[in-house]
Amino acid sequence: MTQNIYDNEEFFAGYSRLPRSIHGLDGAPEWPVLRTMLPDLRGRRVLDLGCGFGWFCRWAREQGAALAEGIDVSENMLARARATTSDPAIVYSRADMERLALPAAAFDLVYSS
């Protein structure tokens, strides 16, 4: 599995204090532009690669996505995402994006930022 700095406790503590970690998508400077490029998510199956704290998965469900799956290599990120998500239509799993094999047409939208 790819090594990641997010499972280093000191780094993760610092990352957790960044605006994007505290304020979610609204704290990410790229979000206003990215949001305008996204299609209508109602009824769609959405995959978030490198889901971090799960902000996009939760937002996708708020927009009507049928399913949101978040994948991350970091156990720390996944633990935070799971702790702040109660929606059964959101699933988080640990995977290495460099080795990820998905079935054809498994998702309607794949997102990563």
Model regions and ranges:
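Class I SAM-dependent methyltransferase SAM/SAH-binding core
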Residues: L47, F53-R99
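Intrinsic disorder/low-structure terminal segments
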Residues: E10-G14, G52, V91, A106
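A short acidic, Gly/Pro-enriched loop at the edge of an enzyme's catalytic core
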Residues: E98-L109
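A short beta-strand submotif of the Rossmann-like class I SAM-dependent methyltransferase core
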Residues: S112-S113
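Conserved class I S-adenosyl-L-methionine
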Residues: M1-L41, W55
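Nucleotide donor/acceptor-binding cores
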Residues: G43-R45
